[in-house]
């Protein structure tokens, strides 16, 4: 009886952590996508400092709220998001607008893709 209760408790803890991690990761992705959309729409209207500040917000968001994400998803996918956000800040700092826009779009697309992978369906299972 003791082993059964321990197993049930462990299962419920695992289920709770997975639910929390999934919600946390989806919120992170939504925040990154919103900030990328804002930066994409206003890229030509922002000054260099505003673009850099916005890119740093994206980078800091991924870095600060990504501790659960790095455990929950494949660590390589999280590293790709973080590295792309870092490249975005460097491209903006060096006034490379074409690479900045490409990096921004890639960050947004990969984040949307990772968020879509969290929805259970036949495509994601096989």
What does each model-identified segment do?
Residues 1-3:
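Positively charged n-region of N-terminal signal peptides that target proteins for export
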Residues 39, 43-51, 92-95:
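Short helix-adjacent coil turns
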